[in-house]
Amino acid sequence: LAAAGALWFQRQRSLPVETPARHHADKAPDRLALWLYSIAGGVALGYEVVWSQSIVQFMSTRTYAFAVVLATYLTGLFLGSALLARRVDRLRDPWGVFGLLIAGAGLIALLEIALLGRWLELAQSAAEAWVLSLGASELLGMSTRFAVAALSIVFVPTVLLGAAFPVALRLSVGRDHVGRNVGEVVAFNTLGGIVGVMLCGFVLIPLLGLVRTLGLLAIIAAGIGYFAVRKGHGVKKGRRQGVIAVGLVSVALALLTPVDKLASLLPGARNGTLAFYEEGRGGTVAVVTQGKGQRAFQRLYIQGVSNTGDAMPSLRYMR
């Protein structure tokens, strides 16, 4: 709301100036990039909401999960922007690059969740053991585990999203009003992020769950990419076809990835059966049944972390 209000106030104060006719033709693609990058901002922060909930089971607490996701997210944005900033003025097909970056970020974000498995825990344990073997503290070893999870799930998509920022600036910023145009790009992207966070946190995740929400975000990202290469001018045929291919793979992956993918990776689920699983605004709750016959017991997971169970030791401890 603050970003929208500031933008409205700035527009009210802007005086109309005489503009040559040729600027009228150039304005349409600029506004298109502005709106597309605004929607991309919603998708990007929607990813952060999903990641903050889905990565918890590979860490110990939600506080650590949020901090690590945010740090990795910002690092990816920084590196992506820095890597492409020096080359963006030499791009001959900025619309094609923009479309591929946004669509590719959506596909990779979904692919990384779809490919999650036992390998991530093994990689975390191996990295922690290596750090401890060097004489590091247990805190550093635990931090290494968290970093491996964040790099495996969050890092690559955010690098692509960060790289899209200088391309969006090139498409949206004119030479006559650099400050105003840059402000518009940041304001619209921020506004899109606000809407994306609210929709994902309060509507999509409770309604669709984490995996399906991530799939929908990937499809929206593919739609942004397709719109960019379809409506933008000077797009190379190969990049247009590449965005279409990325979109088709994203749709297929969104439909084929199991809804309980994250639940199946809970530590207790590997040696038991999933009795209950629900995702909502506050987090995820799962009940896993382990053991057989009279020795069967149930374990409660909140946000992917085992909290208690109905085995005798747990009943005595949690009484």
Segments the model singles out, each with a brief description of its role:
Residues 1-319:
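Alpha-helical transmembrane segments of multi-pass membrane proteins
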